[in-house]
UniProtKB/Swiss-Prot annotation:
Catalyzes the transfer of the phosphoribosyl group of 5-phosphorylribose-1-pyrophosphate (PRPP) to anthranilate to yield N-(5'-phosphoribosyl)-anthranilate (PRA). The gene is trpD. One of its GO terms (biological process) is L-tryptophan biosynthetic process. This is Anthranilate phosphoribosyltransferase. GO terms for molecular function: anthranilate phosphoribosyltransferase activity; magnesium ion binding. Mg(2+) 1 binds at residues 91, 225. Its cofactor is Mg(2+). Anthranilate 2 binds at residue 165. Pfam families: Glycos_trans_3N (PF02885), Glycos_transf_3 (PF00591). Homodimer. Belongs to the anthranilate phosphoribosyltransferase family. Binds 2 magnesium ions per monomer. Pathway: Amino-acid biosynthesis; L-tryptophan biosynthesis; L-tryptophan from chorismate: step 2/5.
Length: 334
């Protein structure tokens, strides 16, 4: 590890083989916490390359628990988190809309890091069991077309890295990695990041991880979702090619909404917001969910444009199908 840390201190990139070897040693308990701290900090100061991020994701995914399922078209829409926007649980709410629209949603998430309520927190408040075993989770997915995979349980190897992350207390390559190490072989993905400078490189990593189609999105003011309070930027992976795009609310036929009016609260409060959206109660929360679900339909290829995706999201919510998906998950993942 000393040689690797020294190399990072000299701002030199690691090869894929070097990164793979280091991560294998870390996740099998052969590296000290202080060395992991130095390693994560060194990568952050140097800047993480596509090769380093891909190698990390591949090793971590290889150590994840496997979910038995015959479904081969799964999608996820989680973000990196850590944007300090204190918004409600946007992607979690949107996941039920996407599932209601016929997409097989394997929602991967964790407890809160920088907000008051992460996806695991809000779903737990809604009665979802975070601790089912892998076989049971596979059955839930087969029966309902939606499942929540609690990252802490899916990635036992994280226990070797978490103390170092907590002692650092700042975003590292691990924050960028969470959405990339889904236990299932995802076909499509909507991934949010608070770093617009990493849109294209993250899309490259998704391509390396085998995604057929994906959108990596960064909202205004570093929101790790699409937002209605300014310009949203995104990278589209389609047909093996990556392209960069952006839009204002007016470009997609939506009204501008300030960030302040989509603030969330604790898990119980965010659960109430989620329910209100799925019950089609008009609010800034509903509009923000419609936008992100619409982008999700576009990322999946279910719609040919973001505008078409938004229209589909409104239809799915108004029909009650999205709310029905929540009730199904509450019934089967309990």
């Amino acid at each position: 590890m000393k040689e690797i840390i020294a190399k990072l201190a000299d701002f030199k990139d690691l090869s894929s083989a070097e990164m793979t070897d280091v991560i294998e040693r870390i996740v099998t308990g052969r590296v000290t916490e202080s060395q992991i701290v130095a390693f994560l900090l060194g990568l952050k100061m140097k800047g993480e390359t596509i090769e380093e991020r891909t190698a990390l994701a591949q090793v971590m995914r290889g150590h994840a628990k496997q979910i038995p399922t015959t479904i081969r078209t799964a999608m996820d829409n989680c973000g990196t988190g850590g944007d300090k926007s204190f918004s409600f649980n946007i992607s979690t709410t949107a996941a039920f809309v996407l599932a209601g629209g016929g997409i097989k949603m394997a929602k991967h998430g964790n407890r809160s890091i920088s907000s008051k309520s992460g996806s695991a927190d809000v779903l737990e408040a809604l009665g979802i069991n975070l601790d089912l075993d892998a076989a049971s989770l596979g059955k839930v997915f087969e029966q309902t077309g939606i499942v929540f995979l609690f990252a802490k349980n899916m990635h036992p190897a994280m226990k070797y890295i978490m103390p170092a992350r907590l002692s650092l207390g700042i975003p590292t390559i691990m924050n960028l990695t969470g959405p990339l190490i889904h236990p299932m072989s995802l076909e499509t993905q909507l991934l949010g990041t608070s770093r617009p400078d990493m849109l294209e490189s993250t899309a490259e990593v998704l391509k390396n991880m085998g995604r057929k189609r994906a959108v990596v999105v960064s909202g205004p003011d570093g929101l790790d979702e699409a937002g209605l309070h300014g310009r949203t930027q995104y990278a589209l992976l389609a047909d093996g090619q990556i392209s960069l795009h952006s839009f204002l609310p007016s470009d997609i036929g939506m009204e501008e909404i300030s960030l302040e009016v989509i603030r969330g609260g604790n898990a119980k409060e965010n659960a109430e917001i989620l329910l209100s959206v799925l019950q089609n109660q008009a609010s800034p929360y509903l509009e923000t969910t419609v936008l992100n679900a619409g982008l999700g339909f576009y990322a999946n290829g279910k719609s040919d444009s973001i505008e078409e995706g938004i229209a589909l999201a409104r239809q799915v919510i108004a029909s009650g199908v999205a709310y029905e998906k929540l009730k199904q998950l509450q019934e089967y993942q309990k």
